Amino acid sequence: MDINEKVLLLAILKKESNESLNDIVLKLENTGMFSLKEGKKLLKKLKTEQFISDSFLTLKGDAIAKNVEQEFKI
């Protein structure tokens, strides 16, 4: 899993209840993390790999996102 995927999963974990996945991608695009096209491609990949379902993390996605959070705290 590359750094962009990790950051996106963490951002989804930390998203506000009124934010959509597209809002998260747009925020990360504004920071220069990746382009909108790349962000949407990453979302699709994470959905295909069953890290995301609808607008939420799956149990698998949640576990990975929490590991990423710990990784970034170091």
Segments and roles (model prediction):
Residues 63-74:
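Short, amphipathic alpha-helical interaction segments positioned at domain boundaries
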Residues 2-31:
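Short amphipathic alpha-helical interface segments
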Residues 57-62:
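Residue-level signal for threonine
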Residues 31-48:
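Short amphipathic alpha-helical interaction segments
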Residues 18-19, 34, 52, 74:
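A general structural signal for well-ordered secondary-structure junctions
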Residues 19-23, 37-38, 56:
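Alpha-helix N-cap and coil->helix boundary residues
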Residues 47-56:
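A short, conserved structural fragment
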